[in-house]
Structures are given as structure tokens and as C-alpha cells.
Amino acid sequence: MGRAKKVVLAYSGGVDTSVCIPYLKHEWGVDEVITLAADLGQGDELGPIQAKALKSGAVESLVEDATAEFVTDYAFKAIKANALYESRYPLSTALARPLIAKLLVEAAEKYGADAVAHGCTAKGNDQVRFDLGILALNPTLKVLAPAREWKMSREQTIAYGEKFGLDFPVKKSSPFSIDRNLLGRSIEAGPLEDPMTEPPEEIYLMTKAIADTPDTPEYVEIGFEKGLPVSLNGQTLDPVTLISQLNDVVGKHGVGRIDMIENRVVGIKSREIYEAPALLVLIDAHRDLESLTLTSDVTHYKKGVEETYSHLIYRGLWYSPLKESLDAFIDHTQERVNGTVRIKLFKGNANIVGRQSDYSIYSPNLATYGEDDHFDHKAAEGFIYIWGLPTRVWAEKTKG
């Protein structure tokens, strides 16, 4: 008896997911494999992927255009949360996984599948994100992960696929593992596994080398409503267009690269290279606008929420009670986060040089040192006395 009768497989067209199709059928006794490829704005033509899946033995090959949903329901939530894993990574790849899990579950329910499958290996984060996402959305579905169990090397995996007529034009000169969507690219493996090796320039596609960037700065203005980016340079844009255009202009100036050692869910450290030009600038601009419109106690408390939120996304807990509760808190804080942030782009830097909001709680008359100063200076002495009273009592008892 096979492990499942009908399986919906998350499919990218790469070596592992292509080999998963005959492996599921011939090694694990699956009767039917349906593949699902998600279009998340990665820019690839998915028609050939459909044909490849059918050639590999799938009974049906699905392509879901979920780019708009990806930006609106996933990326924009992360922007409101200023989500940066370990203070650096804007989760451009991690954010795609709960959406793909959702698409897999929906397809399984629609086509009557009793299992879903993915091609993730045992050392990566994505296996956790897919497994937990699917579990949270439909705990009755089996989750199959052939690449986690088959114990084949890369060469053996390719040889297995070739037995079933699959062709893999793998280039030995390109040993990198790359993932891309509208929000950015992630690059790992190969020579990058040596943390002292400088990444070769050719791995970057969304961001220019500093030597190739314009010699004059460029200014952009991003408009926000309730914490969401809605306009670029005064022009209201739909979410996908805004991200796409901002990627181009920011990347042109060499902004948006990350080279970091990160702590994976499974307990190992990994060297990762990311490109996420628009997402990084949007988070920075959003955080700056919050500093203008939120009270200090909310701003400081929200920082802890943001760190927890980032960890939930990274660790596969998008569909969790805590994540939903944090969303409610974050949404409430964003009611007055409206306004415009001005950014100067030049030679790899994105510097915020201005911000304005009708809901600003910055008061020039209180902040100024000029003649228009309205601050009550006499109140400072009494404030300091009360504020420092615990310190005074402690000092008198211990130093006197």
C-alpha cells in the first residue's frame, strides 16, 4: 500500500521537485501526482514548467498567479511589523512559504488529494514552514517530503531522474542555490559556504555594483496610509506595481544587499546572501514615519513585538494564535501612521532626509531652541527631582 493515493506537489521545475514526481509514484506507491507552481512575481515563464511537470509524470500541472495576494496579505503585514529577522533579513523568501502552503492545501481540497508534498531537504528552514503551515490549515492532510528521506547525492538524484527520461541542464560553474520572488532573491551554497569568501558580483541581479551606480543622487518619496505604502513620488500605485518600480529605482543605486550569518530553525548557522531593495527601504521608511506619529511608549513596546513577529515568520508559525494576536495589536497601532517619507539614494546608501504627516506628534515649538520655544523650562527641575527620587533614596542608603 502506497503512502498516499493522490498528492499535490509544490513544484519549481528544479532537480529535486522534478525527481519527486517519479519518486513518489515508483518508490512510495502514489497513484496520481498533481503539481502546483506559484507565480509570486519571480519573473519566470511558467509555461515550460507546466510542460516539464507533465513530462515528468504529473497527471495535472497547476500554475497559480498569487503575486497580488503575496504583496497585500503577506509582505505588507511584515512591513507594518518592521519585520527583520535578526535585525537584518526582511524575510523576503520566508514570507512566500505560508502562502504556498495555503495554495497547496486549497488545491488538495479542490482535487480530493489525501496528501501534499514538497522537495525540501532536512537541513533547511522551508521544510518547517511548509509542514507547519499545512498542519495549521488542514491537519487531516499527510505531508510527504521525499528529499528529506531519499538520501541521494545531487549526482544520484539527477541519475535517478534520467532513468525516467528527465533532463537536467545543470551547470557546474553555477553551484549556487537561488530562490526569487517579487520581494527579492536569496543565494546560498557553493563557495558562499566559506564565510570569508566575498560573493562574486555575478550572483546579483536586482542591485548594481557601487561602481556601476549613478554619480548623482536620486530622491524618492513614499506615501503611507495606515502603515501601508500606497504611493511613489506622489503617484498612487497598486501594491505590485509599487514594489516593482521601487525595486528598480532602489537597486539601480546599489541599495538592498545583505550578506549575513543567520541562525536556522534546525539549529545550524548558515551564510546567506539576499537582495531585497524595495522591501528594505519600505521597512526603513515605515519605521521612520512611526517615529513621527506614535507615542514613545508604543514605539518602544512595539520593538519587542516586531522581534517576536519576525521570529514567528522565520520559524514557520505564520498561521498561529500568537501571530494573529500580534496582527491585531500592530493593526491598531497603524491607524494614524499616515504621511510621506523622503529618501535620498546614492552609492549604496538609502538615507531618510525628510518626513511629514498630518498626524505628526512632533511639535516644533516644543523642540526648538529658538525664540518660539514653548517648553516650560521651570518644570524640568521638579521633574528631575521626582524622576530621580528612587536613585536619591538608594544613594543615601548605600553611599551615605
UniProtKB/Swiss-Prot annotation:
Q: What Gene Ontology molecular function terms does this protein carry?
A: argininosuccinate synthase activity; ATP binding
Identify the gene encoding this protein: argG
Please list the residues that bind L-citrulline: Y89, N125, R129, S177, S186, E262, Y274
Top-level enzyme category: ligase
The protein here is known as Argininosuccinate synthase
Source organism of this protein record: Crocosphaera subtropica (strain ATCC 51142 / BH68)
Q: Which PANTHER family match?
A: ARGININOSUCCINATE SYNTHASE
Q: Which reaction does it catalyse?
A: L-citrulline + L-aspartate + ATP = 2-(N(omega)-L-arginino)succinate + AMP + diphosphate + H(+)
Enzyme Commission code = 6.3.4.5
Q: For ATP, which residues are the binding ones?
A: A10, Y11, S12, G13, G14, V15, D16, T17, S18, A38, G119
Q: How does it assemble?
A: Homotetramer.
Q: Which UniProt keywords apply?
A: Amino-acid biosynthesis, Arginine biosynthesis, ATP-binding, Cytoplasm, Ligase, Nucleotide-binding
Which example biological process does GO assign this protein? Answer: argininosuccinate metabolic process
